[in-house]
Every structure is written in C-alpha cells, then in structure tokens.
C-alpha cells in the first residue's frame, strides 16, 4: 500500500497520487490500481473522469477501520491512499497507529517549497515514525511543483528540505533525516491540461490517436476549426510525451529502487 499524507492542504497530494504513483503502479502491475481518497471536504479525484488506470473509491473519516484489513492484505502495493490535509491526515495517521503498518506501507509525503510546507512535512514524518519500525526505508518525500529537474536548481528551490548554508533555514527535513529518499515533481501546464481532459499525463502520452492525421483529414474536408482542434491535441500529446520522458521516467527509476513489487 502507498499512503500519501500531509497535515497541510494544498501541497499537491492528489497530483503526486494520480500523476506519479498511479501510472507507476499501473505500469508495474499491468492492471488497474485501487485508488482510495480520504477527504470529507474535497474530492480531487473526481476531475479524472476518463482515466483507465485506477478504480476510484471515496472513504469517509467515519469508516477508517476499513483500512485495517486493506493494510494487512496489500503486501504488494496495489492500493493508493490519498489522504486529505489538515485534520484528516492527523486523524488517519492516529487510526493507523492503533493497528500498525505490518511493514506493508510506503509513505510518500509531498511538499512545496514554502516554509510552512516543510514544517508540516516534518510534523507528518514525526507522526509516521510513531507507526513505522523502519521509517528510513519506508518514507519518501515528493518535492512538488519543482521549477526544474536540475539537481542544483531544486536544491536551492527547496530550502525547506535541503537547507542552505548562507540562508536562515531552521528545521529543514535534512536536519531530521540523515539520507532522505526523495524525488522532484516538475510543474508543467500539461498537468493542468490533463485534469481538464479528465485523464493523467501518462495516459495522454500513450494515447494512440493520430491527431496529425486527423488534422490533415479535417483540412482536406475544409473543416478548418476541427483541424485547429486536432493540432491543439497533437501539441498536448507531444508535451505529455516529453513530460513522461523527462520527469516521470526519472521518478519511476528512483521508485524502482525504493519500492519492491513482486511479479
């Protein structure tokens, strides 16, 4: 099971869950993944109306005991749990603590580059340490909305994670974890586009529709507006492929080292 908590809202938990972890697990297992969203206030996954890589399920905070059996049984990471921010994450972590993780959970803590994001990521990590026997092996950080995938750049962007020798940066993640596992998630407009299209970037990249051929056909039929539409989708498809190649595949490589999935 992959659980994605953060006690702060607005850090992109659903982006990490749907755009990164869902396609990764789908690709590894070759089948739809169970995607559970726990949030009494928001339902971010409802944007993904056309996705074919997950089976979505909402779970209210009044039904958290249903996680007990799922955690015990899912020893091969076929379930993603996207946990809402604020009190929801704290409540879920407190409930899981009562039963334990059975060594079956990988925790992914997302954070942006803001100071408060870092402090809440530390608070979330401390709660997980009360559950996990091996937090160093099982906790991974997602540096969300990275401006660049260049290491030197995101090292300076995420001062709340790495710290900075010339800037005042008290209480950063690396003060609490000696060698943290992490991956940057590059911000890109194609992520926004994918939500409006009801799909994930990964699925958009592997859409077999030949939009170039459709544009040519529309032009030959004199339907210029349709030709423009197909050119638009052709561009998005290309940008999605670039995002998979330059961002997602790099993350998947790291996840392969950290997450053991039995074939």
Report residues per predicted region.
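Walker A (P-loop) phosphate-binding motif
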Residues: 1-24
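Short beta-strand-centered segment that lines the nucleotide-binding/catalytic pocket of NTP-utilizing
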Residues: 26-44
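P-loop NTPase switch/communication element
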Residues: 41-56, 159
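C-terminal lobe/tail of nucleotide-utilizing enzymes
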Residues: 140, 145-263
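Structural motif
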Residues: 3, 80-82, 108
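Switch II (G3) loop of P-loop NTPases
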Residues: 76-93
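Conserved catalytic-core segment of NTP-binding enzymes
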Residues: 88-183
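Glycine-rich, highly charged phosphate/nucleotide-binding loops
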Residues: 58-69
């Amino acid at each position: 099971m992959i659980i994605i908590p953060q006690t702060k809202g607005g850090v992109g938990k659903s982006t990490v869950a749907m755009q990164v972890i869902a396609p990764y697990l789908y690709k590894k297992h070759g089948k739809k993944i169970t995607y559970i969203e726990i949030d009494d206030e928001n339902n971010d996954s409802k944007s993904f109306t056309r996705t074919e890589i997950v089976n979505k399920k909402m779970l209210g905070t009044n039904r958290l005991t249903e996680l007990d059996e799922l955690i015990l049984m899912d020893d091969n990471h076929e379930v993603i749990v996207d946990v809402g921010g604020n009190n929801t994450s704290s409540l879920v972590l407190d409930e899981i603590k009562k039963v334990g993780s059975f060594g079956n959970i990988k925790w992914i803590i997302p954070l942006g580059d803001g100071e408060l994001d870092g402090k809440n990521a530390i608070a979330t990590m401390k709660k997980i340490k009360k559950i996990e026997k091996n937090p160093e092996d099982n906790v991974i950080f997602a540096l969300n909305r990275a401006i660049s995938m260049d290491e030197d750049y995101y090292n300076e962007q995420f001062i709340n994670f790495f710290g900075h020798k010339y800037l005042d940066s008290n209480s950063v993640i690396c003060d609490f974890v000696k060698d943290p596992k992490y991956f940057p998630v590059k911000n890109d407009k194609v992520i926004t586009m994918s939500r409006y299209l009801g799909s994930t970037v990964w699925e958009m990249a592997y859409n077999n529709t030949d939009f170039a051929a459709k544009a040519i056909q529309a032009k030959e039929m004199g339907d210029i507006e349709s030709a423009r539409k197909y050119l638009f989708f052709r561009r998005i498809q290309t940008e999605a492929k670039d995002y998979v190649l330059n961002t997602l595949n790099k993350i998947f490589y790291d996840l392969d080292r950290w997450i053991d999935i039995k074939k």
